[in-house]
């Protein structure tokens, strides 16, 4: 049996389950998950290696009209290189009708030459006939190589999807060593874990006004504890107060929850030191967008 390998980009509207699917496929938590749109800001690269070959997945930010320079960056991240990967996974929600954002995405994908697999997600919350009706509507407007019905949350249909991806990949060597599941640095993943807890614990404009920068990861001498220092950046003083909370309780809760995730990642005890700082209107300033890590890791 020939060994296959290639790159697969996951595209779709915000909050359709792209990150959940990515984590389900590789069997570990690479991308953070939240019920809020635009959780994913960078392309997240994850690797699945099996006897059949190797798939490098790229989970892109959800496609929607940008509202600021950060939004423009995220849209560019989502749409660039669509013709440079081997397969596109176009993820839609089984329980959502086609709307303006989906129409925009359909028009964009219609111009792409890369083979497209339609992935109808969240079949656990609708009747199959509804999911199939949505799929037929999309297939009438877009050339689709294969269609799969899945639940990224509980794993239904995911193994069949992976088999379908391998069928479309070319023969090739492994790009990453066996056992490696991502090529993103630890600092990036730790920052994402902290941001995930902010997404879960805060409301309104706070989640999308936040950037997290990990400044230091250092094992403590004569101890099995790793010291991690990170700064949470917001755009206004009022947001800083919300993140810190009354008597520091919100920041403490964010830190406690994030620490558990980071300890699982690093396999050791963690002392997490969190700070909150203000950078006014950073989402509209190119220099801060770059400084906060919103660039491709090459």
From Swiss-Prot:
PROSITE patterns: G_ERA, KH_TYPE_2. Residues 150-152 are annotated as: G5. Residues 38-42 are annotated as: G2. Residues 59-62 are annotated as: G3. GTP binds at residues 12-19, 59-63, 121-124. Its main location: cytoplasm. One of its GO terms (cellular component) is cytosol. It is a peripheral membrane protein. One of its GO terms (molecular function) is ribosomal small subunit binding. It is found in: Cytoplasm; Cell membrane. It comes from the Bacteria. GO terms for biological process: ribosomal small subunit assembly. Residues 4-171 form the Era-type G domain. Keywords: Cell membrane, Cytoplasm, GTP-binding, Membrane, Nucleotide-binding, Ribosome biogenesis, RNA-binding, rRNA-binding. Residues 121-124 are annotated as: G4. InterPro entries: G_ERA_dom, GTP-bd, GTPase_Era-like, KH_dom-like_a/b, KH_dom_type_2, KH_sf_prok-type, P-loop_NTPase, Small_GTP-bd. Coiled coil: none annotated. Residues 12-19 are annotated as: G1. The keyword rRNA-binding applies. Residues 202-280 form the KH type-2 domain. Monomer. Belongs to the TRAFAC class TrmE-Era-EngA-EngB-Septin-like GTPase superfamily. Era GTPase family. An essential GTPase that binds both GDP and GTP, with rapid nucleotide exchange. Plays a role in 16S rRNA processing and 30S ribosomal subunit biogenesis and possibly also in cell cycle regulation and energy metabolism. This is GTPase Era. It comes from Carboxydothermus hydrogenoformans (strain ATCC BAA-161 / DSM 6008 / Z-2901).
């Amino acid at each position: 049996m020939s060994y296959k390998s290639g790159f697969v980009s996951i595209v779709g509207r915000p909050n359709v389950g792209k990150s959940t699917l990515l984590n389900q496929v590789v069997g570990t938590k690479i991308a953070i998950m939240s019920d809020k749109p635009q959780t994913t800001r960078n392309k997240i690269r994850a690797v699945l290696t099996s006897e059949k070959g190797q798939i490098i997945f790229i989970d892109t930010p959800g496609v929607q009209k940008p509202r600021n320079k950060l939004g423009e960056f995220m849209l560019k991240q989502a749409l660039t290189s669509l013709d440079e990967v081997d397969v596109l996974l176009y993820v839609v929600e089984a329980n959502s009708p086609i709307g303006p954002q989906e129409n925009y995405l359909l028009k964009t994908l219609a111009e792409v030459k890369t083979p497209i697999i339609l992935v109808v997600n969240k079949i656990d919350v609708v009747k199959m006939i509804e999911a199939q009706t949505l799929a037929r509507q999309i297939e009438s407007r877009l050339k689709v190589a294969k269609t799969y019905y899945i639940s990224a949350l509980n794993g239904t249909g995911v193994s069949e999807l992976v088999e379908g991806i391998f069928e479309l990949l070319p023969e090739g060597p492994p790009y990453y060593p066996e056992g490696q599941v991502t090529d993103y640095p630890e600092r990036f993943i730790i920052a994402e874990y902290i941001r995930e807890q902010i997404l879960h614990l805060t409301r309104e404009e706070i989640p999308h006004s936040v950037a997290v920068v990990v400044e230091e990861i250092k094992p403590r001498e004569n101890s099995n504890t790793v010291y991690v220092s990170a700064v949470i950046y917001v755009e206004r003083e009022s947001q800083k107060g919300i993140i810190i909370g009354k008597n520091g309780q919100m920041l403490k809760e964010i830190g406690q929850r994030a620490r558990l995730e980071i300890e699982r990642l690093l396999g050791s005890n963690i002392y997490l030191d969190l700070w909150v700082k203000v950078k006014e209107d950073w989402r509209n300033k190119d220099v801060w967008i770059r400084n906060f890590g919103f660039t491709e890791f090459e």
